[in-house]
Amino acid sequence: MATAIKDTVNNMLSALNLGGKKEEAEPLPDPPSEEEYKELKEKYDNAEQGHVLTFWDELSTGEKGSLYQQLLPINPEHINNISKTALHPAKEENQEKPKLEPFPASATTSTIDTEGDELSGWSEAGLKLISENKVAVVLMAGGQGTRLGSAAPKGCYNIGLPSEKSLFQLQGERIWRLQHLANRRFEKDDVVIPWYIMTSGPTRKATQEFFEQMKYFGLNRNNVVFFEQGVLPCISMEGQILMETKSRAAVAPDGNGGIYQALMASGIVTDMRERGIQHIHAYCVDNCLVRVADPTFIGFSAEKGVDIATKSVRKRDAKEQVGLILQKNGKPDVVEYTEMDSEKAEATDNKDSKLLKFRAANIVNHYYSFEFLESIPNWSHKLPHHVAKKKIPCIDNEGREVKPDKPNGVKLEQFVFDCFPFLEMEKFACMEVKREDEFSPLKNAKGTGHDDPDTSRFDILQQGRRFLEGAGATITSDRGDEEGSGVEVSPLISYGGEGLEFLNGREIKAPAVIEKEQ
């Protein structure tokens, strides 16, 4: 059975051009008119970025059309401004160290410590909002699986589960299950959780084709909406736009913070308004344990009446290299571990010395009110750009290829949490969740032993084991390793451990897959 599934997946990937099959080249656009070219050249010359057109006369008509279409929407003066600010940030004299404090108790909760009745109340409220078609999901899925040894979008990656389901499939089936639960609980038959999927230039086509091949994982295709994050030119250390070839500027995605501009530019916010969406859950594709549109999180955030809420997990120890969610000068913010001195990193909680004072690790798992997303045009221009120094293949002034062996330029990025400080504390909240239940990121290649396919698979299988034991089943195994004692529970029959009563009193031999009642 597993071999048959694997063959099917391999055939599908081949059909998607993810296994080396060449695509037919798309026709190149027509070149600009003489007047259009003159206007473009003047725009870039005035910004002292005219070198992007150095080799214009050498280009074919198709290459001219392609370069023109790429350069036309770029504002080189804007690139100059953000490059200058990012490369040469202003230094404030006598700048005081920022005041860092944990969130006040009024803005936080923990599923680890909270009573079950309160959690159940939030879950019920969240599921009711889902039943009223007021909840949507935004997935950040622009990354490729390069570090995993795959050219496919990261969401297509198979972490090695017995079912061989991809990350996309796990998440899509959780949405399907939630719709089913809301339908059944509130006697509806038309519950919809729209799934907005942000791709990037390199992943857009392959992602959409993957969803087509997989029949949208049982979801209505009209409620799965793809959109693309923006790109920014890569620049030299001196602020000059780098050219990848004579007919193409080097560009890179604008970071996960580009989601806000993309939501507006692609019409997603308008679509949400037309659907009556009020509550939005946003997350990254690489977390195999993510509780998509988590009713408990939605209910908690809605009850608080906040514009943004975020999930966190407890920092493992003082040295774990994670960003921390906290108050910075009285505003919600995320502070990188490099900004924390050892004294602050090791400080313990005033009420419980076994806990770190600053322990809310950022897992990029957020709630937004629709009103906040609708206000994006009022503040998106204030988001800072961050510099990521990279080795960027390009051409030199003579048009010769340059393959640098050390960073030669920068990619400009925005971070999704850069808007947090725009809010007052009363409009922000944080929910601490169990790491083993909700966070297992896929970052590294197989065999790394940390945040890799093996740890992702292990965490899914151990969660399934806990689900079954919670339902009253007994797990046995002939294998001596922990992974051999795990069970894969399909999201189609259980979102968070519910619906498994039929296993009460039964003995399940692991490893096993529970796909349906039997």
Indicate where each model-derived feature is located.
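N-terminal glycine-rich phosphate-binding loop and ensuing alpha1 helix
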Residues: P27-N222, P233, E244-Q261, V269-T270, ...
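Catalytic core of tubulin tyrosine ligase-like
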Residues: G276-H281, L289-A293, I298-G480
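Short acidic, glycine/serine/threonine-rich loops at helix termini
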Residues: G149-A152, A206-E212, S236-I241, V292-T296, ...
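Short loop/turn segments at strand-loop or loop-helix junctions that form parts
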Residues: V138-G142, Q229, V433-R435
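Structural beta-sheet core signal
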Residues: V137-L139, I197, F226, A282, ...
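Composition-driven recognition of long, low-complexity, acid-poor segments enriched in small hydrophobic
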Residues: A2-L18
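Residues at the starts of beta-strands that form the adenosine-phosphate
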Residues: P194-W195, N223, D307, K427
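Conserved beta-loop-beta/alpha segment of the NTase-like Rossmann-fold superfamily
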Residues: Y216, R221-E320
